[in-house]
Amino acid sequence: SATFSHGSFCYIPPDTHCPLELSTYFRINNKESGQFERTLIIADKNSYVSYLEGCTAPQFDNNQLHAAVVELVALENATIKYSTVQNWYAGNEKGQGGIYNFVTKRGICIGNNSKILWTQVETGSAITWKYPSCILAGHNSIGEFSSIALTNNYQQADTGSKMIHIGKNTKSRILSKGISAGYSANSYRGLVKIGPKAHYSRNYSQCDSLLLSNTSKANTFPYIQAQNPYTKIEHEASTSKIGEEQIFYFLQRGINLENAISLMISGFCKEVLNELPMEFAVEADRLLNLKLEGTVG
């Protein structure tokens, strides 16, 4: 990405706290076209930046391709927060059209006490493959990944994260929420690797899946590698459906079915939505409910 010709480049000087939420907007307008933008963000010592990314596309019967590369570099005591709300066209109810979303996202915490936070809300595209990663090279560095992946109709989403611990006393957290409706398939695929010299490092992973139909699928594929005995790794996973008792509870209180489903979806995703900036969180919550209109009931 050092030689990319288009996209975004952001450098935060030492001892600088960026006062604004930097943002970009990507859109694919043409039929059968591809978008290959590059993003490079470098946060120097003792700096902070929050970067927002939004994606949309018009409806076509043909497929388009989005294959971007995002690279984050955090130096000593620096923090980078990267948030994405992805709403590419997902195709029609029969699975025709839509964007193929194949994205490479990676970050490296080079300096000690550095931090990279990935937050993403995936609601669009016909097929999504995305695995944001953190290489925790600096001692005491932190990597976090928070994700909501919603699929409906014939969408396929294969998302997750990679946390590679190299420095000592490094910490990582993975929080994944998957919602499947229609005939869609939603998979979490993640790697947690703690190297031989990453003593006293720790990882916590939580993968929750919610099924909204009898024909949708949810999968979890965690890969865990611990190469020294002084580490702690925790992994939790759950798969559930919205039960009749829950719906009955809302109906008894005068809340109709559509609003009941909306409230339950918001509660299921609350932990991830709270990681987004306030304006983004409100819009992302509305987007999730909009994508599921008419799905249940």
UniProtKB/Swiss-Prot annotation:
Record's subcellular location: Plastid, Chloroplast
Pfam families hit by this protein: SUFBD_core (PF01458)
Gene Ontology CC annotations of this record: chloroplast
Tagged with keyword Plastid: yes
Keyword terms of this UniProt record: Chloroplast, Plastid
Entries under InterPro entries matching the protein: Fe-S_cluster_assembly_SufBD, SUF_FeS_clus_asmbl_SufB, SUF_FeS_clus_asmbl_SufBD_core, SUF_FeS_clus_asmbl_SufBD_sf
Main location: plastid
Superkingdom per UniProt: Eukaryota
Protein family (similarity comment): Belongs to the iron-sulfur cluster assembly SufBD family.
Stated name of the protein: Iron-sulfur cluster assembly SufBD family protein ycf24
Organism: Antithamnion sp.
